[in-house]
């Protein structure tokens, strides 16, 4: 069995339901293989128009990916174009990562603000 068959991508999401942070993320855990695509969802509690996405790799602090406000991308960090997203009229947001790489294994967080 070659080493490529044993290489799995593990993507974690924090928050299985509404909490004080004011967001619901889904799915909460996800296992994908290299080269696949993934869609992560974030639903903020109503009244919060801005959603930010972060990646936290093992042993590191969170890194800013991008922020959406009122359905428009307001700012973005230094991530490749494989990371894309959008925000809907109800302020829910999706982040897509295409062509997964080993370095994408991380905890992914979304945060809301007014």
Curated annotation (Swiss-Prot):
Key word Signal present: yes
SMART domains: IGv
Protein name (database record): Probable non-functional T cell receptor beta variable 5-3
Domain Ig-like residue range list: 22-114
Gene3D superfamilies on file: Immunoglobulins (2.60.40.10)
Primary localization: membrane
Cell membrane is among the record's keywords: yes
Domain of life (superkingdom): Eukaryota
Leader sequence segment: 1-21
Protein keywords: Adaptive immunity, Cell membrane, Disulfide bond, Glycoprotein, Immunity, Immunoglobulin domain, Membrane, Receptor, Signal, T cell receptor
Summary of subunit composition and partner proteins: Alpha-beta TR is a heterodimer composed of an alpha and beta chain; disulfide-linked. The alpha-beta TR is associated with the transmembrane signaling CD3 coreceptor proteins to form the TR-CD3 (TcR or TCR). The assembly of alpha-beta TR heterodimers with CD3 occurs in the endoplasmic reticulum where a single alpha-beta TR heterodimer associates with one CD3D-CD3E heterodimer, one CD3G-CD3E heterodimer and one CD247 homodimer forming a stable octameric structure. CD3D-CD3E and CD3G-CD3E heterodimers preferentially associate with TR alpha and TR beta chains, respectively.
Gene Ontology CC: one annotated term: T cell receptor complex
Parts of the chain that traverse the membrane: none
Subcellular location: Cell membrane
GO biological process: adaptive immune response; cell surface receptor signaling pathway
Pfam families listed in its UniProt record: V-set (PF07686)
Residues carrying sugar: 96
Function of the molecule: Probable non-functional open reading frame (ORF) of V region of the variable domain of T cell receptor (TR) beta chain. Non-functional ORF generally cannot participate in the synthesis of a productive T cell receptor (TR) chain due to altered V-(D)-J or switch recombination and/or splicing site (at mRNA level) and/or conserved amino acid change (protein level). Alpha-beta T cell receptors are antigen specific receptors which are essential to the immune response and are present on the cell surface of T lymphocytes.
């Amino acid at each position: 069995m070659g080493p490529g068959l044993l290489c799995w991508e593990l993507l974690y999401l924090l928050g299985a339901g509404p909490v004080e942070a004011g967001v619901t993320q889904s799915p909460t855990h996800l296992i994908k293989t290299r080269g696949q695509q993934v869609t992560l969802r974030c639903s903020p509690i109503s009244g919060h128009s801005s959603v930010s996405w972060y990646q936290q790799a093992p042993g590191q602090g969170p890194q800013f990916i991008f922020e959406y406000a009122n359905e428009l991308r307001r700012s973005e960090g230094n991530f490749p174009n494989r990371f894309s997203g959008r925000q809907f009229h109800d302020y829910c947001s999706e982040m897509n990562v295409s062509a997964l790489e080993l370095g994408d294994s991380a905890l992914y967080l979304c945060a809301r603000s007014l």
